[in-house]
């Protein structure tokens, strides 16, 4: 029985992807593995930690086979980035043989199919901006909808103001994009890139997508886009605003939530954030502080004197980010006026 188990564990092809990842992380050591974890989600970290805990004795042969497969996959990815799948297959066939090349490309296939615009995601945002700003707004909208919100937000904020609203509107109205369209845009942006083999429509864009992007933009960009959309498409603007949270919306928080937020905020940051807001917003904050704390905050606001609008908006953005984070964690509730927010 033990002999059979030993024979099976030497066969890399019998291992799952998670088991291979666990063996790889153990093989490269804790110092490098901890750096890898920084790029993983909490769920992925927990899953891999569980797999590592389940590992028994790892033979040298098994470890070497896993490391070799990882090396081959990394080599294939590098070739694909340089010249596409055909180029990668040609080089792999020359160095590893036809069958091995086919196996490696097949292993990478599913990942390539599910990640359009991979080469754009790896690029520096400033380079992407230079790369796409002359493109049609619909093309820009398609590309931004596939990027992570932080990178997309930087690019959207950096576009000419007359283009920002157009692009944001197109992202919000985007529903499903044909793989043929995605492939065509990819061909224009990169001469050789792995084409999508799936004929299913890929979801990208939509109101939630544009809200996430705008939420990460600076206040000036956020305000400009919303005000412009209110003129061009009031219904869409209203739908977006319902899903957004801006600093002035702090009045929508119940007292318990505001008190929870205040525990996390630096006093000087809060003083700056309140400098230019309406009295009702300030009063909502003061109401949820002790008299002494409220008095100290008012003194801090007066002591600050004239403050650059940019600094005020940065402080407001930090607090908004904290509020959104606490809402995601379920620690506070933001009432947006929907039926789901009604207390019973």
Swiss-Prot record:
Family of the protein in this entry: Belongs to the FliG family.
Keyword annotations of the record: Bacterial flagellum, Cell inner membrane, Cell membrane, Chemotaxis, Flagellar rotation, Membrane
Pfam family membership, one: FliG_C
Record protein name field: Flagellar motor switch protein FliG
Location, primary (coarse class): membrane
UniProt-recorded Gene Ontology molecular function terms: cytoskeletal motor activity
Motif (Part of the EHPQR-motif): 135-138
Gene name, Swiss-Prot/TrEMBL: fliG
Membrane-protein topology: Peripheral membrane protein
Coiled-coil region(s): none
InterPro entries, A to Z: Flg_Motor_Flig, Flg_Motor_Flig_C, FliG_a-hlx, FliG_M, FliG_N
């Amino acid at each position: 029985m033990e002999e059979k188990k030993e024979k099976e564990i030497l066969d890399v092809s019998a291992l799952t992807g998670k088991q291979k990842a666990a063996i790889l992380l153990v093989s490269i050591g804790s110092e490098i593995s901890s750096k890898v974890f920084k790029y993983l989600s909490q769920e992925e970290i927990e899953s891999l930690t569980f797999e590592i805990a389940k590992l028994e004795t790892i033979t040298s042969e098994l470890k070497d086979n896993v490391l070799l497969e990882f090396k081959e996959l990394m080599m294939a990815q590098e070739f694909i980035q340089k010249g596409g799948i055909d180029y990668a297959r040609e080089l792999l066939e020359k160095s590893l043989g036809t069958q091995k090349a086919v196996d490696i490309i097949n292993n990478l296939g599913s990942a390539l199919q599910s990640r359009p615009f991979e080469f754009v995601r790896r690029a520096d945002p400033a380079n992407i901006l230079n790369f796409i700003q002359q493109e049609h707004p619909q093309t820009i909208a398609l590309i931004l909808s596939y990027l992570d919100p932080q990178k997309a937000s930087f690019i959207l904020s950096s576009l000419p103001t007359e283009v920002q609203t157009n692009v944001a509107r197109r992202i919000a109205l985007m529903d499903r994009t044909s793989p043929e369209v995605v492939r065509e845009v990819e061909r224009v942006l990169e001469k050789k890139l792995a084409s999508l083999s799936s004929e299913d429509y890929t979801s990208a864009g939509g109101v939630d997508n544009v809200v996430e992007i705008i939420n990460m933009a600076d206040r000036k960009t956020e305000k400009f886009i919303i005000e412009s959309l209110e003129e061009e498409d009031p219904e869409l603007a209203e739908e977006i605003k319902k899903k957004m949270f801006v600093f002035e919306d702090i009045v929508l928080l119940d007292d318990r939530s505001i008190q929870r937020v205040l525990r996390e905020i630096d006093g000087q940051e809060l003083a700056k954030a309140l400098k230019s807001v309406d009295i009702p917003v300030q009063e909502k904050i003061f109401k949820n502080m002790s008299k002494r704390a409220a008095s100290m905050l008012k003194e801090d606001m007066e002591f600050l004197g004239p403050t650059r609008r940019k600094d005020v908006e940065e402080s407001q953005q930090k607090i908004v980010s904290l509020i959104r984070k606490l809402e995601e964690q379920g620690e506070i509730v933001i009432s947006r006026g929907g039926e789901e927010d009604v207390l019973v």
